Amino acid sequence: MVVAELQTKVEKYETKASRCEQQARDAADKAEQSFYQVLAGYYGSLAKDFRKILEKRLIA
């Protein structure tokens, strides 16, 4: 993967995590809130992993 593609993925997953965090705050009940919190964590983790890969690519 090229650096631009990695950056795109980082931005994509950060955006998804942010949206899920907002949906968790707006959730009508605890189950929905919990679902979106877990999903936000998942997308945040993906963004973090892609950011690490991107940083390694930029250093190399």
Where are the language model's segments positioned?
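Short, charge/polar-rich alpha-helical segments
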Residues: M1-E14
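Short, charge-rich amphipathic interface segments used for partner binding and complex assembly
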Residues: T15, R19, Q23-D26, K30-A60
